[in-house]
Amino acid sequence: MKLLVVGSGGREHAIAKKLLASKGVDQVFVAPGNDGMTLDGLDLVNIVVSEHSRLIAFAKENEISWAFIGPDDALAAGIVDDFNTAGLRAFGPTKAAAELEWSKDFAKEIMVKYNVPTAAYGTFSDFEKAKAYIEEQGAPIVVKADGLALGKGVVVAETVEQAVEAAQEMLLDNKFGDSGARVVIEEFLDGEEFSLFAFVNGDKFYIMPTAQDHKRAFDGDKGPNTGGMGAYAPVPHLPQSVVDTAVEMIVRPVLEGMVAEGRPYLGVLYVGLILTADGPKVIEFNSRFGDPETQIILPRLTSDFAQNIDDIMMGIEPYITWQKDGVTLGVVVASEGYPFDYEKGVPLPEKTDGDIITYYAGVKFSENSELLLSNGGRVYMLVTTEDSVKAGQDKIYTQLAQQDPTGLFYRNDIGSKAIRE
């Protein structure tokens, strides 16, 4: 069996590597992928994610069994619809189902209609009305671009002035283009955040281990929001009862609701949750695997990944098993200046030894192909599975101290919340 993974980041590296380790898989192509993936025997295809017709032609020419779609923008652009129209299988939601992610207002409407707990909100395309709502509600308050904004379209405003400025940047200054033509303004929810993922086909779903991401750029959850600077799974201090509540009050009604709306969901559903004093509530949905959570969840999968996905797509009950013990922890290494302006072309340290996994993202080979260089904001991620969060931290941070990646930076406290609890 030959498979195609669409995307280029650390998430796609983790997906493709796990698929290649599956029994019936002979070859995994990644389009466009990144040069670091070739170190794990993955084959790169020089086609960008937006070129649906070229991807379809490649899949047909190379007799690809099915494609796994990684990035949100491809799903929002209807890549799964295009593959299906061409008679090809793709694991991911249609454009209509992926609206759970590409329109925050749509997601809110679904949650309200199907009684799913989430923050109170208002949606606005008019700046003056948004400003009046902010002033009426007070701070802290959250301002979100309605559409996709590379994980940068959310502002947690601590003052009314900050919130008004965020709304102005989105609605008047066109900061996020069409994605910010509407804003969703939400009440601020206080509590601990965690992520819940599920493999989904219609109203059938299969929950993965819980995970906790670290969005802020710097230690102590300081600095700007990023795509994610590290993660660990499972979340050891999160009671199973909370997960069960989230499944029954959030995941199940949303997926059954999507079927009722004529938008049945196929693919990976990410639910960003916060555990409040009133129980778990939804912060956001993503219509695909998270990055960096994929890189710490998939190493815990002990069943055959490709077979699992194939079964789910075929409507067959999959045999999915997960590692029961230990914790998987990963730290992202990013370019100095990320998530804003940063330099490219910084030489990467030597590949790690032993059982630490390296997932590559923003990298490319030097001209003589002897050296990997930085070529993006998030560059690579080191991942290990150990008996505890502390043991995982010790192993990764010892390795990073030895690498001493000049021109790059990382957080020193990934997983520390679990140790403090």
Swiss-Prot record:
Pfam families on file: GARS_A (PF01071), GARS_C (PF02843), GARS_N (PF02844)
Cofactor annotation remark: Binds 1 Mg(2+) or Mn(2+) ion per subunit.
Catalytic reactions of this protein: 5-phospho-beta-D-ribosylamine + glycine + ATP = N(1)-(5-phospho-beta-D-ribosyl)glycinamide + ADP + phosphate + H(+)
Protein residues bound to ATP: 134-195
PROSITE patterns: ATP_GRASP (PS50975), GARS (PS00184)
Mitochondrion recorded as keyword: no
Catalytic EC class: ligase
EC number: 6.3.4.13
Single GO molecular function: ATP binding
Top-level taxon of origin: Bacteria
Keywords in alphabetical order: ATP-binding, Ligase, Magnesium, Manganese, Metal-binding, Nucleotide-binding, Purine biosynthesis
Domain annotation ATP-grasp: ranges: 108-314
S-S pairs: none
Cofactor requirement: Mg(2+); Mn(2+)
Pathway recorded for this protein: Purine metabolism; IMP biosynthesis via de novo pathway; N(1)-(5-phospho-D-ribosyl)glycinamide from 5-phospho-alpha-D-ribose 1-diphosphate: step 2/2
GO biological process, one term: 'de novo' IMP biosynthetic process
SUPFAM superfamilies named in the record: Glutathione synthetase ATP-binding domain-like, PreATP-grasp domain, Rudiment single hybrid motif
Residues engaged in binding Mg(2+): 284, 286
PANTHER family, A to Z: PHOSPHORIBOSYLAMINE--GLYCINE LIGASE (PTHR43472), PHOSPHORIBOSYLAMINE--GLYCINE LIGASE, CHLOROPLASTIC (PTHR43472:SF1)
Family membership noted in the UniProt record: Belongs to the GARS family.
Protein name (record): Phosphoribosylamine--glycine ligase
Species assigned in the record: Streptococcus pyogenes serotype M3 (strain ATCC BAA-595 / MGAS315)
